[in-house]
């Protein structure tokens, strides 16, 4: 099994055009050093992948959070598709080992350079879209990105506690309290449960990997309750 067969097995998709897959992992420095091979770099695929990623993530957020304001969805999407997040996704599936670099870029540490890794993730999305279609891109993101959204990893970019405070205090002063109800799971993978109480009435409960995430989740539930009355 060569490295490209290994990569396809790793991501769970077969490419009809393996050259397109190779291009997604080809840095311009490699092209400059292999001009006789007529290879193409990944910059155009990165351009396309960036747009496909924004569309698919936007669609997921739009459907998952039907009551979230546009501004908050924008902030959340920005946190998901920012360079540090893309690097995390690329590292999780060991993309760096497949990147084709020029010797100079390799010596300069390009294989672990964050911007380069983020670009490769986007160019792979572009190649996957061209070769397999948008549905397969969504299937891939359902394994790599969407579970992190579901787990609340990006909720800190959306301050539901502030939103809730603004909603309930529009007409009167109220007392908002948050209680941590308990925790479950082993030390390395804890989950916390929280509730939000407004003027003595429990309005929402939620859970999260941290106490802050649990409180944010409870506030989000309370907002949903209030806006659907």
Curated annotation (Swiss-Prot):
Q: Does the keyword Lipid metabolism apply?
A: no
**Could you tell me what reaction this enzyme catalyses?**
Endonucleolytic cleavage to 5'-phosphomonoester
SUPFAM superfamilies for the chain: dsRNA-binding domain-like, RNase III domain-like
The segment(s) forming the DRBM domain are 159-228
Swiss-Prot/TrEMBL GO biological process terms: mRNA processing; regulation of gene expression; rRNA processing; tRNA processing
Q: Does the keyword Chaperone apply?
A: no
Its domain of life?
Bacteria
Major localization class: cytoplasm
State the PROSITE patterns in the record: DS_RBD, RNASE_3_1, RNASE_3_2
Q: Where does Mg(2+) bind?
A: 46, 119, 122
Which cellular component terms (GO) are annotated to the entry?
cytoplasm
Q: What sequence ranges are listed for the domain RNase III?
A: 4-133
Q: Function, please?
A: Digests double-stranded RNA. Involved in the processing of primary rRNA transcript to yield the immediate precursors to the large and small rRNAs (23S and 16S). Processes some mRNAs, and tRNAs when they are encoded in the rRNA operon. Processes pre-crRNA and tracrRNA of type II CRISPR loci if present in the organism.
State what protein this is by name: Ribonuclease 3
Q: Which cofactor does it need?
A: Mg(2+)
Q: How does it assemble?
A: Homodimer.
The record ties this protein, via Pfam families, to: dsrm (PF00035), Ribonucleas_3_3 (PF14622)
- As recorded in UniProt, its EC number(s) are 3.1.26.3
For this UniProt record, the keywords arranged alphabetically read as follows: Cytoplasm, Endonuclease, Hydrolase, Magnesium, Metal-binding, mRNA processing, Nuclease, RNA-binding, rRNA processing, rRNA-binding, tRNA processing
* Listed GO MF terms: double-stranded RNA binding; metal ion binding; ribonuclease III activity; rRNA binding
* Annotated localization: Cytoplasm
- This chain's source organism reads Listeria welshimeri serovar 6b (strain ATCC 35897 / DSM 20650 / CCUG 15529 / CIP 8149 / NCTC 11857 / SLCC 5334 / V8)
Query: Catalytic center at which residues?
Result: 50, 122
Query: Which family does the entry's similarity section mention?
Result: Belongs to the ribonuclease III family.
